[in-house]
From Swiss-Prot:
Matching PROSITE patterns: AA_TRANSFER_CLASS_3
Protein name: Glutamate-1-semialdehyde 2,1-aminomutase
Modified residues (N6-(pyridoxal phosphate)lysine): K265
Keyword rRNA processing carried by entry: no
Database matches in HAMAP family: HemL_aminotrans_3
Keyword RNA-binding included in the entry's annotation: no
Entries under InterPro entries matching the protein: 4pyrrol_synth_GluAld_NH2Trfase (IPR004639), Aminotrans_3 (IPR005814), Aminotrans_3_PPA_site (IPR049704), PyrdxlP-dep_Trfase (IPR015424), PyrdxlP-dep_Trfase_major (IPR015421), PyrdxlP-dep_Trfase_small (IPR015422)
Entry's EC annotation: 5.4.3.8
BP-aspect Gene Ontology terms: protoporphyrinogen IX biosynthetic process
Coiled coil start-end: none
Organism: Shewanella baltica (strain OS155 / ATCC BAA-1091)
Cellular component aspect of the GO annotation: cytoplasm
Subunit and partners: Homodimer.
UniProt cross-references to Gene3D superfamilies, sorted A to Z: Aspartate Aminotransferase, domain 1, Type I PLP-dependent aspartate aminotransferase-like (Major domain)
Amino acid sequence: MTRSEALFEQAKKTIPGGVNSPVRAFNGVGGSPLFIEKANGAYIYDADGKAYIDYVGSWGPMILGHNHPKIRAAVLAAVENGLSFGAPTELEVQMAEKVISMVPSIEQVRMVSSGTEATMSAIRLARGFTNRDKILKFEGCYHGHADCLLVKAGSGALTLGQPSSPGIPEDFAKHTLTAVYNDLDSVRTLFEQYPTDISCIIIEPVAGNMNCIPPIPGFLQGLRDICDEFGALMIIDEVMTGFRVSQSGAQGYYGVTPDLTTLGKVIGGGMPVGAFGGRKDVMQFIAPTGPVYQAGTLSGNPIAMSAGLAQMEALCEEGLYEKLSAKTKRIAEGFKAAADKHGIPMAINYVGGMFGFFFTEQPEITRFDQVTQCNIEQFRIFYHGMLDEGVYLAPSAYEAGFLSMAHGEEEMRLTLEAADRVLASMKAAS
């Protein structure tokens, strides 16, 4: 038994399922999860001391690589002054100014402690501002575990949502409508059914929780136009894509302007953090300037602000995103080339520092129903083959992969050579 396996057995005695977030349990791929002891650059090291080239990056935040010296120095300097004050700090102001300078649609921003807090608060604000109860989300998109968001579509386009988890009253779920990602007609159908009831659309601009699904041309702007037509707010959830896809997020990359934006992951530099921001008139509707309540003991935590600021400043380096995109393209297209070489059907998607691959004969993947038709068993085999080769991918066929600036020529070469060997063995076994 490895030390990771022993720790997992020990953890299950005191932690539900042995993990503090379900995907970490490896239920999507089978086997026991790795317990991580440390990380540096493009590598993570498990409890047995084995190194892995990491394409999870703490699920997105580690865009510069693990344990980056500038971020580490910023955190250590901040710790000297105390860990938490529960009062305003100059660091919060600096972070707000940095975010606003990088994302033109954000005129004011409020810091919180997680992505779930950010989306939950943005939706409450949209409901309060519009005085409407219903929200519209998309099948396959994930916006955190707030009750109103753990909702799946009903049996028809016009049916009300159904809870996707026990513990969520149907009275909550009935206010959440679910449309088809990359399908404007499904959105318009719902708005025509509820023309004065929908407060907002919330969307992942690149869906990163059904693997990696970019928007088709015109989709995001089409949502913007529908919101304007029916008086709803557009919330772009950039918890994953913010400063990961481009310096101004996915909204800058695709040229669409939301009313509200949610942020997380990258803006914390690896520390727990979230934020939501947008139009000043909307943001002024939140307490203490407005009637919509939102608060948090650790919001704007000085350690998190220090780490985030250090990372955000580093991301302003000229040419950084072009380099990151080139790395992502090389890995995604390298996987596809290796699969083609061995006669294994595969589709790929990638944008900025995110990528996804699908074992499927479908030529392209643009919707959730297409994702569910992919070969999950082939993914599991590939996943464990790559893990044995020292490459750590997301342990789920429904999660995006992430590159960092620390992934160099050596790491990419080793990764693609490993993929070639694993795919060759999969073909031989078939």
